[in-house]
Amino acid sequence: MRALPLLLLACADGAGKPSAADDSGEAPVWPPDPSTYDCSASTPPARWIDRPAGCATDPTCTETLVSGHRGAGGALGVIAPEDTVHSVYAAVAYGLDFVETDPRPTADGALVNLHDDTVDRTTSGTGDVATMTLTEVQSLQVDLVDFPGDWSCAYIPTLDEILLAARGRIDVLVDANKTDRVDLLVEAIVRTDMVEHALFDTSSVEKIDAALLIEPNLRTMIRVDSEAQLTEQLAHFASHPPVIVEINDNAPELAEVVRSLGHRPLMDVFLADASAGLTGDTTMYEAALSAGVMIPQTDRPDLLLPLVWGDDQPARRSD
């Protein structure tokens, strides 16, 4: 197994108290320079967004929060290589509230954070993750595309490494749809002391049931496609309600239904990301927020966050 980077080991929990100001008393410059979160950074960025850290996992929190897909962006992302430790740092530097993860098992039973079932798209290698050892997966060069900054240290991390990078800085959505090894997922969350800040996220009711048998205090996130499914799952989990309810982006009308039942809806906004990225038109973002989506999940936090913050933007623009 690849040794944890010294930066990661030294700085887990190093975020300090949330603050919207730097040492000079001024709000941080935004968007952040890549040197604050890439491989050249001497320390990971601290959580700076001026919001109570507990808001992310508090079902009664009414603020609009933003989740970074695969860290600071997936296939449409322009900030950092997806699903890497430094994509978590980038999400923190940008002021996101959550990062979404993609853990899947290797042949020797390690959980690596990789969206696809093969390494072909995002690395220099080829092959199915399930047939490769952790050492083989972590020896591959991550595809850096054209991300600005220094990514020479980027590699495919384990779930533990992602959780440690996030601890004290940002909350984590642990996607449980890519493996049946519920035990490994829960063990990683417990082992990294992230039970209060990692959400077990899946469309499988059975997996959530199994996870809660292992760790009854686990935070959860359900996924629903219809009002009937929403009603059924909320009844099933009445004794342990989900922290977040993810709705299908084909059914934004469910957002208000979720809210009317006292829950917070999360929805992917990838079509809006594509539209805003290509044309600069943010209409689709605005439509999602107007529909009642409280937690948009995005590949383009650089485009969505200013819209969510509006006149209350907690940072100084660098442009």
Where are these regions (language model features)?
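Sec-dependent signal peptide recognition
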Residues: M1-L6
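Phosphate-group recognition and catalysis centered on beta-loop-alpha active-site segments
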Residues: D13-G16, G25-D319
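A structural motif detector for short, solvent-exposed N-terminal "entry" segments of globular domains
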Residues: S19-A20
